[in-house]
Amino acid sequence: MIERGKFRSLTLVNWNGFFARTFDLDELVTTLSGGNGAGKSTTMAAFVTALIPDLTLLHFRNTTEAGATSGSRDKGLHGKLRAGVCYSTLDVVNSRHQRVVVGVRLQQVAGRDRKVDIKPFTIQGLPTAIQPTEILTELVAERQARVLSLPELKERVEAMEGVQFKQFNSITDYHSLMFDLGVIPKRLRSSADRSKFYRLIEASLYGGISSAITRSLRDYLLPENSGVRKAFQDMEAALRENRMTLEAIRVTQSDRDLFKHLISEATSYVAADYMRHANERRIHLDSALVLRRDLFSSRKQLVTEQYRHVEMSRELAEQSGAESDLETDYQAASDHLNLVQTAMRQQEKIERYQSDLEELTYRLEEQSEVVSEASEQQADNEARAEAAELEVDELKSQLADYQQALDVQQTRAIQYQQALQALERARALCQLPELTADNAEEWLETFHAKEQEATESLLQLEQKLSVADAAHSQFEQAYQLVVNIAGEVSRSEAWQTARELLRDWPSQQHLAERVQPLRMRLSELEQRLRAQQDAERLLQEFCKRQGNAYQPEELEALQRELESQVEELSLSVSDAGERRMAMRQELEQLKLKIQELTARAPVWLAAQDALSQLSEQSGEALEDSRQVTEYMQQLLERERETTVERDEIAASKRAIEAQIERLSQPSGAEDARLIALAERFGGVLLSEIYDDVTIDDAPYFSALYGPSRHGIVVPDLSLVREHLQGLDDCPEDLYLIEGDPQSFDDSVFAVEEHEKAVVVKIADRQWRYSRYPEVPLFGRAARENRLETLYQERDRLAERYATLSFDVQKTQRTHQAFSRFIGSHLAVAFDADPEAEIRLLNTRRGEIERALNAHEDQNQQQRQQFDQAKEGISALNRLIPLVSLLLDETLTDRVEEITEELAEAQEAARYIQQHGVSLTKLEPLLSVLQSDPQQHEQLQESYVLAQNSQRLAKQQAFALTEVVQRRAHFSYTDSAGMLTENSDLNDKLRQRLEQAEAERTRAREQLRQYQSQFTQYSQVLASLKSSYDAKRDMLKELSQELVDIGVPADANAEARARARRDELHAALSTNRSRRNQLEKQLTFCEAEMDSLQKKLRKLERDYHQIREQVVNAKAGWCAVMRMVKDNGVERRLHRRELAYMDGDELRSMSDKALGALRLAVADNEHLRDVLRLSEDPKRPERKIQFYIAVYQHLRERIRQDIIRTDDPVEAIEQMEIELGRLTEELTAREQKLAISSKSVSNIIRKTIHREQNRIRMLNQGLQAVSFGQVKSVRLNVNVREAHATLLDVLSEQQEQHQDLFNSNRLTFSEALAKLYQRLNPQMDMGQRLPQTIGEELLDYRNYLELEVEVYRGADGWLRAESGALSTGEAIGTGMSILVMVVQSWEEESRRLRGKDISPCRLLFLDEAARLDAKSIATLFELCERLEMQLIIAAPENISPEKGTTYKLVRKVFQNHEHVHVVGLRGFANEIPSLPPIAAELQQGG
């Protein structure tokens, strides 16, 4: 539910007794309590002044002046104010919770008139915390303040953010804003509305039943319904204009057709040719622009191709130079590969001979061993054979000499004894007590080693001595070997040098063995070095292509960057494809849209022409369809207002004509019946008697006779009495004066003259006071003077009526044009400008085409960047694995190091190869070099020492050897026994002899076999030595040849050389392919440049030709445009919809119009000649001259009495308006005549029924109201009997009175008035016209009677009159009536204000002490039920327990008067009383 707005407070500033006082208003009842003169009425007057600041209405009288009609000139306001600026403001919070401060600035005006100047204003958006007094006053000191002037107040308010200040120069605007904000219940459009509202407030303020309101309850409670009256006014206007319309149509039709046909055909003829030339000029300009654009683009393309040609030529030169270098490198690589292959074949031979040598060496060694073993075996066999021979011989000798054998046994026995002695001797000599026969052999090995060392030393010395003595030639041989190997050395250093050489020989051999691994390692390093160089070359090429210098460690980051770039470019390329497709699709869509807009443009242009015509007709800028419809509504409203004004003018004109007709009656009779009665009574009209009175005396006599100036002067009244019986056809008041018509004077009256007035003593107890009429009509001079004025007024009204009629038809014509526009063009008129859209789309298409070209270029650049990035990534993919290689700064050093090592190894190999044999020969001869034959003495001494050492060692070894040798003797223990046991000795010797002979035979046979085998082995060894020597010589030759080749022949050399050659071959092929590609591209580029140059020359030639055409055509076109603009016909000729037609269509259109124009101007020689001259196609300006001639001709034909323009096109439009106006009037007449009397009756009845129901609803709110003996209040509404009869006849018996409604002489209103008179003949209509009566009968309010009734005690329902009620009852009843009126206004105005606004309700009651407590309680209950605020003034506090009560006491302090105010809030809800309000601020100096 919408919360009702409330008045929060009332603020008085600088009023009498109140300097700056704010009264907080209660939501229900606010009571102002105080004695007489306390300021209660002043407070209420301030409230009313802020609510209705209309000085023509404000009248603050005391209750004692209730019946007074005049008072002081200030009407009670001037005396309530103090000198200076005063304010009265109302603080309101409406239903929207918007705080609004409304008020007035009041100021006394110096002078005797005691006037007050009032300026209303409003403040919106004021914060709640700020009180009105803070805004209206300014503190000067602690207890002093100054009142701000209105400009200062405005400046202060506007300085606050969000606060709006508005000052009003019109009370209507002030009340309009108050109504919109919900402060007042009714929109007060006029002074009459304000008067009603003030009368209501005044009735509320002074209490009682206001006769001004009860007499006009219909005006207060019933809203006006002018729909029926307006409808019949329109119908009657159509009837009056019928004949004039028909005549005007016949007069205007011929001119309109002529104008329209000639203008239409001339416009088509000239505009078609004009637009054709404009189109051709535009086409030529577009062609020139296209050619210029192509020219510039071709020049740009040629420059691009030339730049490409230069770049490709430079690259081709680089590629050619690189190809030469690559061919040289490739040839060198091929030669190197051949050398490597030759070296490899040589190496294979060397390896083969080396393997053969190794095999021969192995076989030679094996054969040597075999020969050595064979020699040893032969020596053993020879020894065994010799031993066997010796044993056989010994056995034979033993057998021959048994005694000798016996001696042998003895000898063995001795040998046994000697063995024991030798053992003891060895123990002593070797100092080995633990020596036994069993371990003697072990000790023998030890002492043999010592002996061997001593022997070796001795042998060395012996060798030296022998060399010195017997082998001097061997020393020379060894020394020569040392010199051959080591160069020149002294003889003394020969042995040391030879020893060092032999000591270094193994290391040299080791180095020689490392040649192959070092060569392989060097090959690997050289390969890495070449790879590094290739990588550096690749890096340099990469940096050159990238245009930046990159370090190897930056390559990985660069690779990531390039991969990211490739990814972005890939996405960009893919997006570019999609975007290109999207742009092409958009381009196609744009082309389709342009085609669609091109097809729609003529329709839109036609709509725009229509819209521009409407704008010119209306004078409004129509920017959207809403404005069109709103303007149509305005047109309807304007048409209604103009029609109403025209009808009012017509009514005034009819009234003046009726008055003229009445004043034109003979003898000055206003009623024709008076003449007949004067003849009947035999009298003379009084006006005829005074017909010759002067115009100066006419006012006096008119006032003198008053109503009897239309009387009849008869000679004898007694004779007239009998004629009065049954007299009905006469005026309502008929004056008969007895007197002589021939000598009549004014002596019959006792007259007393005053200033412009007379007092006529009709009788002793009856006087008549008559003022001089402003327009006297008594006497022929006065009537003629009045008639002259009326004739002038009638002429003025007739002219005004014609103007209004034309305006009505023009408005209707404009409305029809708007209707046609809405029907035909509204759907497209406010669409976007298709031409602007076409321009935008063309611009967009150009942008897209440029963007597409730029996109292609960008895409190509991106592709190039993409390819370059991919190529960079590809190069990086080759470079990244080589980063470690590029970063290997020690590679060159390692290569040099390995190269040095290999050189050393190869040097060692060559050394071994050169001196290996010498070293082999030198090794056994090393000892020879130890002693120089020239150093014999020293050797001799050394030899003696060595001999002594060797002798001792030998003695010890001999002693041990003797023991060892005599180990067999230790087994001769039985030989001692043999000396006694010799019996079987002979047999044993024989057996042993046989065994020895058999053994000798086997030894001889084995010796012969081994001698044969040794001979074979020796032959094989000699053969192997011969083959070995031959192959060794060949190997030396091959090695020398390999050295002469100078190429290492390792296993990977051929692969590296082949890979190098293949790599250079691939690079050479790539270079040749690129060079061929560049040559082809260069050829194509040259061809393209030749083609572009040819195209450029053709474009320049075509551009200069078409530019020359455009320049030549410009002069003629400028002349045409100047002529068109000078004569103001450009808007007529420049028809943009024709721009979308081709030249053939425009020529056809012009030719058709030309044929029609030839027929149209056949009778006009001037136009015919101008038309014939305009047919020259080479002189387009002559067509413009023809069009201007047609315009001039038609301008001369315009009828200025009908058409108010000199423009033929506008004349046609005005003719159309005139014809439309006339036709529409006929149509409107027929339509409005179709309105039946029954429908009028139904409308009035429905309206009456609706209002009766509304009043019944209002009555329900007053049923429980009681004041004193009054228990209830109600409002009765009844239909008048005569009017009810009229409604019944209109709806049920209209056929009986068709003579009235079908009459051409009577309007509907007059017919309705006549019907009312027919139904109620007893009623006197007085002097009112039937039209006026009929218009009153069309107002439903005249059908109703309203009266207020109260239910009082035992009397029941009585009419509410002040005389029948007590004062309190009258006040309560009057308050109830006012509440009903306010509710009615709110209901009536609900549709005019916002739906979220519920207006404030507030009434006043002064001197409320006249109500008893029960009545006061009823008022409180009524306020609570109706959400109404009430301000009560009473001498005493009448209801302190409810509402808010202010106690006002007026005090005088030091000649300064102020009102002391104490506020008390009602304590019914246990709310504590308000603290006393502080004393008034003292007025600032």
Swiss-Prot record:
Keyword annotations: ATP-binding, Cell cycle, Cell division, Chromosome partition, Coiled coil, Cytoplasm, DNA condensation, DNA-binding, Nucleotide-binding
Classification via Pfam families: MukB (PF04310), MukB_hinge (PF16330), SbcC_Walker_B (PF13558)
Gene Ontology MF terms: ATP binding; DNA binding
GO cellular component, as recorded: cytoplasm; nucleoid
Sections of the chain in a coiled coil: 337-480, 509-605, 835-915, 977-1116
Annotated residues for binding of ATP: G34, G35, N36, G37, A38, G39, K40, S41
Classification via HAMAP family: MukB (MF_01800)
Function summary: Plays a central role in chromosome condensation, segregation and cell cycle progression. Functions as a homodimer, which is essential for chromosome partition. Involved in negative DNA supercoiling in vivo, and by this means organize and compact chromosomes. May achieve or facilitate chromosome segregation by condensation DNA from both sides of a centrally located replisome during cell division.
Full protein name: Chromosome partition protein MukB
Native source organism of the sequence: Yersinia pseudotuberculosis serotype O:3 (strain YPIII)
